[in-house]
Amino acid sequence: MSSNFEHDHEENEDYGKQFRPDREIYVVKKDGSKELFNVQKVISAVGKSAYRALTKFTKEEKEQICQYVVDKVNELEVDEVPIPIMHNIVESALEQVKPIVAKSYRDYRNYKQDFVRMLDDVYKKSQSIMYIGDKENANTDSALVSTKRSLIFNQLNKELYQKFFLTTEEIQACRDGYIYVHDMSARRDTMNCCLFDVQNVLTGGFEMGNIWYNEPKTLDVAFDVIGDIVLSAASQQYGGFTVPSVDLILEPYAEKSYNRALAKYERLGVAADVAEREALADVKKEFEQGFQGWEYKFNTVASSRGDYPFITVTAGTGTGKFAKMATITMLEVRRKGQGKKDHKKPVLFPKIVFLYDENLHGPGKPLEDVFEAGVECSAKTMYPDWLSLTGKGYVASMYKQYGKIVSPMGCRAFLSPWYERGGMHPADDKDQPVFVGRFNIGAVSLHLPMILAKARKESRDFYEVLDYYLELIRQLHIRTYAYLGEMRASTNPLAYCEGGFLGGHLKLTDKIKPLLKSATASPW
């Protein structure tokens, strides 16, 4: 009780009575009005700046600020002090006592003018969006009302991010073109791209939208549920959303559908070979309808963000008969396209990435027919993308050494390894890397040619200039980690609470900071 009383007493203390100037002094405001100087108002203002900087002043620090401000006002030897001069005095006092608050005060003191400019920019952009549209992102249809609303909000969010998250140096680097901060309209809210662990979410059932979903018992239900999971979870992030090794995810549900169909035909007294053939045909049909359903859903149903999520699936390494059937059927559906008869064309989503292993897909190998289906699809549609697991480079090295597949997040972003026990570095020779269930918190691009030109123009070492911008990016990412770490698991329940992300079995009220340790942040 005593500590609370002392705290309340300190908050209510009037420093204006304790620290007074030598004479009666007035502060001249921007509108020309005058107000009697009272240092207590300074304490109130800097207290708000300290709060924005996530800190607070001690009683001694407040007294230091008061004494400094009153002394400087006395030194002016005037009866009226313009508000800009008063701001400079207060800022100088904060630099002496707590520099981090000085920056917060400096950034915020002209907030009225900044907000007028900011809202004017947002208004101009909103008018353009409402009557002309927006062509910045091909994934968003700016003709739709829901998308227009989302784009206007994004413009406001971008302005707020630039004003209150980026430092002066970072803003200048962006304006000069040396760095580019991707997705400024969304970075304050959530993460970028991911390899979502759909299998982990499905296993044993899960909760979505306050409704409990049992684990699917058939393939057609699995397709429906996975489609719902993908659209719901992808709406809570802004980057590419990948379902890795989808053939292996669907395989056990195809097995369940097959057993169910086989039992049905056996009950009808059908011959064993006919029952097996018909059961396989039923499963094939479920695969066809399921993949067609995904193509329609992912290309026509916009997310709650107002865009069509960049959804990717990878497949091709499953050797079981139903895993093979999954990959081949998916490629056939993409090759045939969607639309009116005689006017069908391939859709965009989900983007398909074929995982090629020369020991599985080469001539005479177990998955040669899967490879041929991929080649035929590529010849007609330019899909799928091909990712070699046994060639050269980082992805192949991880596959050869650990047997782990590094699927792309979206189209081109690959996760660096995170080891089960060692974290960033393997604990020993038996430590295994984890990729599925991990994500990236944001990307910042470097303009290397411009940095080289700057180094030459200023006769400086290229790496010295490069290090300056790399350090800017590092500090930006560090602040992003700290900021996102304060978010609650309720912001993306499927990822943080139902197992979509690595370690994602938090309570809704838990902070997500523990999950960020395996997340990456990218300079491109």
Q: Residue spans of the language-model regions?
A:
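Charged, amphipathic alpha-helical regulatory modules used
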Residues: 2-130
